[in-house]
Design a protein with these regions (language model features):
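Extreme N-terminal starter segment of soluble prokaryotic enzymes
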Residues: 1-3
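Residue-level signal for inorganic ion chemistry
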Residues: 7, 31, 87, 147
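Conserved active-site "lid/cap" helical segment
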Residues: 37-85, 129
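Short beta-strand-loop/turn "lid" adjacent to the catalytic site in phosphate-handling enzymes
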Residues: 76-122, 143, 150-160
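Acidic, His- and aromatic-enriched active-site or binding-groove loops in soluble protein domains
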Residues: 166-174
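Conserved small/polar residues in nucleotide/adenosyl-binding loops
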Residues: 176-183
Length: 183
């Protein structure tokens, strides 16, 4: 099965199309400057990078451009969306609610929104990507993959080490180490 992996930032979108059986990357790319002037780098496996500057006023447009690149007659790697079995979305913060990846439902979206207080730059952007993919690829399973899930498998003494207990008891704060630590 081919899986489209999406990592949305506030003005960027990284993607890979992966054959899950062989674990090979069929194509990868980056949409940058979404909402500004747009820049795309697309690289099918074994081919040179293709760079262009299509208008990308929003993430939905950017994801549409990614789909067009993946299905392009000359530089695409699949003939249609029918060859994609699922979409995986990087979600930075799932709080204590998510200990592993999960299918995205309305309830999952609501809970990720609630966790956005802990990742205000990343979670809203991730959800924009989820909603855009749901619109453009209806019926495809969407999966949330949480950066914080690893931390939910740690013993309490490890994730509370270094912070006063009251921060956890009153606000749900935990000690996480990741690239989102600046938030």
């Amino acid at each position: 099965m081919n899986v489209l992996v999406i990592n949305c930032g506030s003005s960027s979108l990284k993607y890979q199309l992966i054959d899950s059986e062989t674990e090979s990357v069929l194509a990868k790319g980056l949409c940058e400057r979404i909402g500004i002037d747009g820049a795309l780098t697309h690289q099918p496996a074994g081919k040179d990078k293709i760079k262009s500057t299509p208008a990308m006023p929003d993430h939905k447009t950017a994801i549409g451009i990614v789909i067009d690149q993946l299905t392009d007659k000359e530089n695409g790697v699949v003939e249609s969306l029918d060859e994609i079995g699922a979409v995986g979305h990087r979600i930075v913060h799932g709080g204590e609610k998510f200990t592993k990846s999960c299918l995205i439902t309305d309830e999952v979206i609501k809970e990720v929104e609630e966790c956005s207080v802990f990742a205000p730059l990343h979670n809203p952007a991730g959800l924009i990507g989820v909603r855009a993919c749901q619109e453009l690829m209806p019926g495809l399973p969407m999966v949330a993959v949480f950066d914080t899930a690893f931390h939910q498998t740690m013993p309490e003494k490890a994730f509370l080490y270094g912070i006063p207990r009251k921060y956890y008891d009153e606000d749900g704060c935990l000690l996480y180490t990741s690239d989102a630590a600046d938030e």
